[in-house]
């Protein structure tokens, strides 16, 4: 069995999240479960690397990802139900607003 050590990368920072992880699931958040059955939830992140030989999993954090994952969840729901959910439009507007803020913040930090 392969237990993973999970790291979270954000901007120029990498930190350990948990270890001995056997299970990972992406919903609106990433749900991680270790060998003892302890569950850790990581918000606004995606899995960027899984390496069995190194027994490591790397996650990327960005605040904008929370609503992107939510949008994808609602998209799946729409297809399953065969109808459009107006909540998709609300989430999309939130993503655009967060995207503008994200770009402005990056420009302020790094220059234009």
Features from the language model and the residues they span:
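Compact, glycine-rich, soluble single-domain proteins
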Residues: 15-72, 78, 103, 111
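A short beta-strand micro-motif
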Residues: 3-10
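Generic preference for well-ordered secondary structure
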Residues: 8, 16, 31-34, 83-86, ...
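Short secondary-structure transition/capping segments
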Residues: 76-77, 94
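C-terminal charged interaction modules
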Residues: 84-112
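Short, cationic low-complexity segments
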Residues: 76, 82-83
């Amino acid at each position: 069995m392969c237990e993973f050590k999970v790291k979270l990368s954000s901007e120029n920072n990498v930190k350990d999240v948990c270890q001995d992880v056997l299970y990972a699931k992406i919903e609106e958040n990433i749900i991680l479960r270790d060998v003892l059955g302890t569950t850790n939830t990581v918000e606004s992140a995606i899995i960027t690397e899984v390496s069995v030989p190194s027994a490591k999993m790397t996650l990327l954090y960005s605040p904008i990802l929370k609503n992107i994952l939510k949008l994808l969840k609602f998209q799946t729901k729409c297809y399953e139900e065969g109808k459009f959910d107006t909540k998709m439009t609300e989430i999309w507007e939130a993503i655009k607003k967060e995207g503008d803020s994200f770009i402005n913040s990056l420009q302020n930090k790094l220059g234009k």
